[in-house]
């Protein structure tokens, strides 16, 4: 899972993959778009948005 740009449905799919059964915030906290779509984010950073 390399650092990558993740926007829209790709971001949601990545969150499902990373968070699994824990789930994630339905409305992600502010910052995930800036971090992962405008910038790049890692799997470790995505885990911060899991429940």
From Swiss-Prot:
GO molecular function: hormone activity
Protein location: Secreted
Stored Pfam families: Insulin (PF00049)
CDD domains cross-referenced by the UniProt entry: IlGF_insulin_like
Keyword presence, Repeat: no
Keyword Transferase carried by entry: no
Self-association and partners: Heterodimer of a B chain and an A chain linked by two disulfide bonds.
Family assignment from sequence similarity: Belongs to the insulin family.
Role description: Insulin decreases blood glucose concentration. It increases cell permeability to monosaccharides, amino acids and fatty acids. It accelerates glycolysis, the pentose phosphate cycle, and glycogen synthesis in liver.
Protein name (Swiss-Prot/TrEMBL): Insulin
């Amino acid at each position: 899972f390399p650092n990558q740009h993740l926007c829209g449905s790709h971001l949601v799919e990545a969150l499902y993959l990373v968070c699994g059964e824990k789930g994630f915030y339905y409305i992600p906290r502010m910052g995930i778009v800036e971090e992962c779509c405008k910038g790049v984010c890692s799997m470790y950073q995505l885990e911060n948005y899991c429940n």
